[in-house]
A protein has these predicted regions:
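Conserved strand-to-loop turn within each blade of WD40 beta-propeller repeats
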Residues: 58-61, 101-104, 144-148, 156, ...
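WD40/WD-repeat beta-propeller blade-loop signature
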Residues: 37, 51, 76, 83-86, ...
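WD40/WD-repeat beta-propeller blade N-cap
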Residues: 29-38, 80-87, 122-129, 148, ...
Length: 642
């Protein structure tokens, strides 16, 4: 996600000091599937005899999903969409609250058993938020850690209390989301997407809540774990030490040394006395926090250990990581067993009774047998080995040809994902993008409609690019990235308005052939067509209900009375969306942007219902769509056929 500064205005200007970017994310697949690697897993056990378990997954595609789990099937029942970058971790804090963190520097809370409503956005971190930890017996307490060397402890009950000031009242005090003193937004600001899908921004400064900061990390934090009671917190990262904290005060209690590389994962037993750590040094270590020392080291993996999951009694540990392998280790006897291997590094594990869910850098999620309630059953199959004490011991075994044979060959259930895009090329016509995904399929996209117009299958990307080369010259008006596993199209003003084509070259029927069409303006109209229609319907209904038969322009004027946009009611506002700019409603793109309040948000274009505050959109975007007005530029260029 392209990060931009705060939307502060000068006292003499009616426009933001720095214009915001608008991004739209394209997809051509079912929304019930992830399109990038899955970073995190959380299992919610059934609360009733007739209910089912739920699996929550968070992905590098920026979304979370809820899966209803049956014996031989998993059905996606909800997609949680609001983060604008990778979802890095998620925890359950109570029966109905899901907490997620992201590379967009935020935490978000969700009502996990409803329709995917984001209830709050918590802002405190200055960099990517990489990990979370929750207290089981004190479900209000959640800790977060990130790349900024920051660890915060949140009391969700206090953080999520109703605010004393409404968004409108705050707007009167601060028209642009900036305090009267000229400072930036308060330390913690919360963005709500209500059940009606209306986006509004609030801050919790009015109730004075600030999370507890556990200060002491000098470098990035990658792992957290918290005791069930919420009285003990452990953290680890690039400093190679395990730090122990009192989360109630943020004070350090001890520091444990032993690992020789980054600490990537941590676990605590239910009492908070025993701690397991996994590291990029390929080692798993067991710490006795009462004795403040490492009591066992396990050389099981041949590469970085990225995730751990323990049995309920903390007698055995499942581990996975960069070596593509899932191991089961008896912590008392040091006996280890290779359960399975795959094609992708393992990012996170989640036990569900006698099964274990495995998330990897692939978009699919696999379920494997684990015998979590009686792991000794697995060891009866044979093939185990004794874990060494030194990291090179497993590597030596591997080199000598005695690599363990996996117990299981195939998963018992696969939740399929869609292949993510890993390569792209913008073609010379500046309307088509050629892509290649993880399956090797090459596709041609028309970005002004957000659809795939040709699927070439598994062909040479370079040869197809040469074949599609055209001798045309048109200015670059958008940029592209594939960080989320999909095509993200970025529009920045005024550059995005630099490209024009003749209507005849776009095959627009009924428009004079020599009329020039601005590609960005028409694309914006297509993206916001649903929002404009809902907005018109909403204000028209309100006017009709009040017995007001005023013109549509009057309705628009009333809706923008408190807006920062000065509507030119004499401007010709052609709301028609031409066919080359009609976006799919079957696979609708998502918009990622931020308004004057400075907080990014993400939403499908078909979920925009007209109730969104105009201040949540970039100024230049609405000025273009509502007023047909473009920013001034020195040179206008259009398509030249050679």
């Amino acid at each position: 996600m392209h990060r931009v500064g705060s939307a502060g205005n000068t006292s003499n200007s009616s426009r933001p000091r720095k214009e915001k970017r608008l991004t739209y994310v394209l997809n051509d697949a079912d929304d019930t599937k992830h399109s990038a690697g899955v970073n995190c897993l959380a299992v919610l056990k059934s609360l009733g005899a007739d209910g089912c378990d739920y699996l929550f997954t968070g992905s590098r595609d920026g979304t979370l999903k809820r899966w209803a789990l049956m014996e031989d099937a998993a059905t996606c029942s909800t997609t949680f969409e609001s983060h604008v970058d990778w979802v890095n971790d998620a925890v359950l804090a109570g029966d109905n609250t899901l907490v997620s963190c992201s590379s967009d520097t935020t935490l978000k809370t969700w009502n996990c058993l409803t329709d995917g409503t984001c209830t709050r956005t918590l802002r405190q971190h200055s960099d990517y938020v990489t990990c979370l930890a929750a207290a089981d017996k004190n479900s209000n307490i959640v800790a977060s850690g990130g790349l900024g060397g920051e660890v915060f402890v949140w009391d969700l009950e206090s953080a999520l209390v109703p605010l004393s000031k409404s968004g409108d009242a705050m707007e009167e005090d601060s028209p642009n989301g900036i305090s009267g003193s000229g400072n930036s937004l308060p330390i913690t600001s919360l963005r709500t997407i209500s059940s009606s899908n209306c986006i509004s921004t609030h801050t919790n400064q009015s109730n004075g809540y600030v999370p507890i900061a556990a200060k002491g990390h000098k470098e990035s934090v990658y792992a957290l774990a918290m005791s069930d009671s919420g009285t003990l917190l452990v953290s680890g990262g690039t400093e190679k030490v395990v730090r122990v904290w009192d989360p109630r005060t943020g004070s350090k209690t001890m520091k444990l040394r032993g690992h020789t590389d980054n600490i990537r994962t941590l676990l605590l037993d239910s009492t908070g006395r025993l701690c397991l750590s996994g590291s990029s040094d390929s080692m798993i270590r067991l710490w006795d926090l009462g004795q403040q020392r490492c009591v066992h080291s396990y050389a099981v993996h041949t590469d970085s250990v990225w995730t751990l999951a323990s049995t309920p009694t903390f007698s055995h540990v499942y581990s996975g990581g960069r070596d593509l392998s899932l191991y089961l280790t008896d912590l008392a006897t040091r006996e280890s067993l290779l359960l399975c291997t795959g094609e992708h590094p393992i990012l996170q594990l989640a036990l569900q009774d006698d099964n274990i869910w495995v998330a990897t850098t692939d978009s699919s999620i696999n379920r494997w047998p684990a015998e979590g309630r009686n792991p000794q059953k697995v060891f009866q199959r044979g093939g185990s080995f004794l874990a060494g004490n030194l990291s090179f011991s497993r590597a030596k075994i591997s080199l000598e040809g005695s690599t363990p044979v996996p117990v299981y060959k195939e998963p018992t259930l696969v939740i399929p994902g869609t292949p993510g895009i890993v390569q792209h090329e913008i073609l010379n016509n500046r309307r088509n993008v050629l892509t290649k995904d993880t399956f090797g399929s090459v596709k041609l996209w028309e970005i002004s409609r957000g659809i795939v117009i040709e699927n070439y299958g598994k062909v040479s990307f370079e040869e197809k690019k040469e074949e599609l080369f055209e001798m045309v010259s048109i200015p670059a008006w958008f940029t592209v990235d594939t960080r989320l596993g999909s095509l993200s199209i970025h529009l920045d003003t005024p550059q995005c308005f630099s490209a024009e084509m003749y209507s005849t070259d776009l095959n627009i029927v009924g428009k004079p052939e020599d009329d020039k069409v601005n590609l960005a303006r028409e694309t914006l109209k297509g993206l916001l067509a649903h929002w404009l229609a809902k907005r018109k319907q909403r204000f028209g209904f309100q006017a009709s209900a009040n017995g007001d038969v005023s013109s549509g322009k009057d309705i628009s004027h009333r809706s923008l009375t408190h807006s920062r946009i000065e509507v030119d009611f004499n401007a010709e506002n052609d709301a028609m969306v031409y066919p080359p700019f009609e976006f799919s409603t079957v696979f609708p793109p998502s918009i990622i942007t931020e308004g004057s309040h400075g907080g990014p948000w993400r939403k499908k274009i078909t979920d925009l219902d007209g109730t969104e505050d105009e201040k949540d959109f970039p100024f230049w975007c609405l000025d273009c769509v509502l007023n047909n007005r473009l920013p001034p530029r020195e040179n206008t260029k259009w398509l030249i056929m050679l």
